[in-house]
Amino acid sequence: MKFEKIHNKGQAQIFRNKYLEYLTKTHPLVIWSLYLPVIIFLLYYSIARLHFSAGKALLLFGSGIFFWTFFEYIIHRFVFHFVAESPRARKISYVMHGNHHEFPRDSQRLFMPAVPSIILSSLIFLVMKIVSGTFAFAFFPGFLLGYLTYASAHYAIHAWHPPFKWMKPIWRNHHLHHYKDDEKGFGVSSHFWDIIFGTAFNLKAEKEDKEAVQKLMFKKKEVQNILR
């Protein structure tokens, strides 16, 4: 997904049909409101109805969060950055992730839209249920929270400066992925798997361009409009 120009303003038109185009956009609070009740209910169900101990539920929940970080890396590297050859495959690749690389500051497409998100998460839960049985009721909520954390971190990286100094490497890693080399830095919420698989940036060797980074952030007025 190499583009002649990366646009820091505007957004891609993915579909000509205005209704389909509308479904490609979402607000972070919509996704949180969809999945937070599911997380709470499944944890309640695993303890109250399946009689998991609090320790067992917490272990499965934590394992789900950790598994998300691996899933995030694999999907980003091998699915979102799949090298498409045919025109149809390139179109699919662009719809899934290419539009984000061409318009990285499009605030309406920093979370997966609700409809495909619900379909995909339902399929993932079904697979987990088949593989792990009732354990999925405590494991899947952790996986979902991992996704929400990742998506929120992704949103924050494109919207604001890191709120804490220790978060700065996470921000720099993703900026370098977008603006220097999209074959590295596939982890967004964590560098762990990039380090394991040798795709991490050497942040100490990368010169930071503060002026260029400033151009990536949303302006105060933009943020206020988004949060309304």
Predicted regions and their residues:
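Residue-level detector of transmembrane insertion/anchoring sites
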Residues: 62, 66, 144, 165-168
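Interfacial helix-loop-helix junctions of multi-pass membrane proteins
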Residues: 157-170, 183
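N-terminal start-of-chain detector that recognizes signal peptides
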Residues: 51-53, 147, 163-167
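Active-site rim elements
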Residues: 180
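Alpha-helical membrane-embedded segments
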Residues: 144-151
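Short, membrane-exposed interhelical loops at transmembrane-helix boundaries
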Residues: 170-176
